[in-house]
From Swiss-Prot:
Top enzyme class: isomerase
Pathway per the UniProt entry: Carbohydrate degradation; pentose phosphate pathway; D-ribose 5-phosphate from D-ribulose 5-phosphate (non-oxidative stage): step 1/1
Subunit organization: Homodimer.
Cellular component GO terms, alphabetical: cytosol
Residues at the catalytic site: 103
Organism whose genome encodes this protein: Enterobacter cloacae
NCBIfam families found in the cross-reference section: PRK00702.1 (NF001924), rpiA (TIGR00021)
Protein name (record): Ribose-5-phosphate isomerase A
Keywords of the record: Isomerase
SS bonds (residue pairs): none
Function recorded in the entry: Catalyzes the reversible conversion of ribose-5-phosphate to ribulose 5-phosphate.
Length: 219
């Protein structure tokens, strides 16, 4: 199976967690896009979705799925999203698609975070994938200096502006042994909106696409 076929398999597998009559939290990226396609087959059974990016909102609406502002929603049963890396503790690096802040907000509200990923995203130690940090534009250089002190090598993601109007620094060279401590440390830097470490709020369920089928891991 190709990588895209593995992503499609886990996207469709996540449908089993969607309860009729509910509002579903939806992530961003190539794997989440397959979940949105799958969700389109249930559009008459769900109330709608909360979206983590303008791109996902556009796709949801194109399939006839109602998109709610998070402020209108009291609770979310599930949030379904991909990951750039996921470790054995169900901690993740996310933000390759620059939607990390909205993703983290929606994940924090949801009762259950379901991570959908192909097997190439599974790692023992996080950090080989550059760690994205969303930053207020005026603080870019100041934040970069602090990230160097934490042992990283930040690179400005040229030409990318987030849906929130901010910029992204991708931090290379990190071997993340204590993901919760690093998430807290980076989030404490003035000018950081959030870091793409999902450690304090990791995944509850991981659906991993493998050549032998979809593997389910429960926290």
């Amino acid at each position: 199976m190709t990588q895209d076929e593995l992503k499609k398999a886990v996207g469709w597998a996540a449908l089993q967690y969607v309860q009729p009559g509910t509002i579903v939290g939806v992530g961003t990226g190539s794997t989440a896009a397959h979940f949105i396609d799958a969700l389109g087959t249930m559009k008459g059974q769900i109330e709608g979705a909360v979206s983590s990016s303008d791109a996902s909102t556009e796709k949801l609406k194109s399939l006839g799925i109602t998109v709610f502002d998070l402020n209108e929603v009291d609770r979310l049963g599930i949030y379904v999203d991909g990951a750039d890396e996921i470790n054995g503790h169900m901690q993740m690096i996310k933000g390759g698609g620059a939607a990390l802040t909205r993703e983290k907000i929606i994940a924090s509200v949801a009762d259950k975070f379901i991570c959908i990923a192909d097997a190439s995203k599974q790692v023992d130690i996080l950090g080989n994938f550059p760690l994205p940090v969303e930053v207020i534009p005026m603080a870019r250089s100041a934040v970069a200096r602090q990230l160097v002190k934490l042992g990283g090598r930040p690179e400005y993601r040229q030409g990318v502006v987030t849906d929130n109007g901010n910029v992204i620094l991708d931090v290379h060279g990190l071997e993340i042994l204590d993901a919760i401590a690093l998430e807290n440390a980076i989030n404490a830097i003035p000018g950081v909106v959030t870091v793409g470490l999902f450690a304090n709020r990791g995944a509850d369920v991981a659906l991993i696409g493998t050549a032998d089928g979809v593997k389910t891991i429960v926290k």
